[in-house]
Design a protein with these regions (language model features):
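Substrate-recognition element of Asp-dependent hydrolases with the DxDx(T/V) motif
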Residues: 58, 63-91, 97
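Short, Lys/Arg-enriched N-terminal segments with co-localized hydrophobic residues
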Residues: 1-11
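Acidic, Mg2+-coordinating phosphoryl-transfer loop and its flanking beta/alpha structural elements
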Residues: 126-159
């Protein structure tokens, strides 16, 4: 099959899978837990605006291992948002990805981090997200996998489902 002048065998390509960061790959609460009380009070109601908070966060349980397993069958990208009023969040998210997945050209997410408030603009087969009705996820063309839902409460359930679909 030809696509825009490039010869491709569509059936041989991996499906595209986007993965959200906050509360999917990254345990947002772990960053909050590391803040001092003064900062928690100052930023109450908008803790994602705390400068540097994203650098403090730990991975969700087994998230890193699960992603490596999914990479065997899928073409992976991270698709996340970053708070508009917290410029450090944009940098911290990139640094978090480098810390947990590497930063050389052969690393899993090298130049595969997309930060957007319009997830619907990305075309793919699957999106794993904990907020399926926010930031365009509800208009995503592929299937949205609602992380931390009854059907997909954890990474184990997500991996089992997606490995069957690959």
């Amino acid at each position: 099959m030809y696509f825009r002048g490039v010869k491709k065998r569509i059936s041989m390509e991996k499906k595209i899978l986007y993965i959200d960061m906050d509360n999917v790959l990254v345990n947002f609460q772990s960053g909050i837990d590391k803040l001092d009380e003064k900062t928690k009070v100052e930023y109450a109601g908008h803790l994602d605006d705390v400068p540097g908070i994203f650098a403090l966060m730990d991975p969700m349980p087994v998230a890193v291992e699960a992603v490596h397993r999914l990479a065997e069958k899928y073409d992976l990208y991270i698709l996340s948002t970053a708070p508009w009023n917290n410029p450090s969040a944009w940098r911290d998210k990139l640094n978090w990805v480098k810390k947990h997945f590497g930063d050389d050209k052969d690393s899993l997410f090298y130049k595969r981090l997309i930060l957007s408030h319009h997830k619907n603009l990305c075309k793919g087969d699957y999106l794993i997200d904990d907020r399926p009705n926010k930031c365009g996820a509800d208009q995503f063309v592929g299937e949205v996998i609602h992380f931390n839902s009854e059907k997909f409460p954890d990474w184990k359930s997500v991996v089992e489902y997606l490995m069957e679909k690959a």
